Amino acid sequence: MSDLTNADNEREPRLITETGLDQRLADIIEPVLVDLGFRLIRVRMMNQNGATMQVMAERNDGTMTVQDCEEVSMAISPVLDVEDPVDKEYHLEVSSPGIDRPMVRKSDFVRWQGHLVKCETSILIDNRKRFRGKIVEAGTDGFTLERDQIAYGEEQKVTIPFTALSDAKLILTDDLIRDALRADKLAKAQAANQNEADDEE
């Protein structure tokens, strides 16, 4: 897993964005999140248990605590009440992207290089639109997967342009859990050190 500084990914646009009502919701929510120091991962309006607006967000370092979810919820609720983009009652659910997270930015592919991902493309690449494999390289224009399941005659590696990506998600493995926990522990230690430095000033 690669480390990125906050400055590298703070304003990085998402590769995969919403459409329709979800896009309108993202347009309302994202500026509020950015002002608080968070990044929007995804917004989805779902019709389960009534209507639920699911907002996935994270700090620039990739972390998201329960307190962060509460802070985001308290900040976006009044804005959503004023804008009133949904014409029915709904439940607001704010969460972290989780360990098996959606991959929505170029930096996600850099950060999680070496891990398994499943993805879909909007166009055929090597005669298919669905892929699964380990991210072996990520650049400015796309990423390379080493496929773990190939059919006869297919190449082991495939390069997918970011412009063709329509969906991508990490696959839960023991290595992913280990690296995610390690990254979370490091981020918490850095935050604690920052808080100590702020207290001394």
Swiss-Prot record:
Signal peptide: none
Protein's job: Required for maturation of 30S ribosomal subunits.
Disulfide bond entries: none
Domain of life: Bacteria
Compartment list: Cytoplasm
GO biological process: ribosomal small subunit assembly; translation
Main location: cytoplasm
Family as reported in the entry's similarity comment: Belongs to the RimP family.
PANTHER family: RIBOSOME MATURATION FACTOR RIMP
Keywords: Cytoplasm, Ribosome biogenesis
A Gene Ontology term for the protein's cellular component: cytosol
Protein name, UniProt field: Ribosome maturation factor RimP
Record has Cytoplasm as a keyword: yes
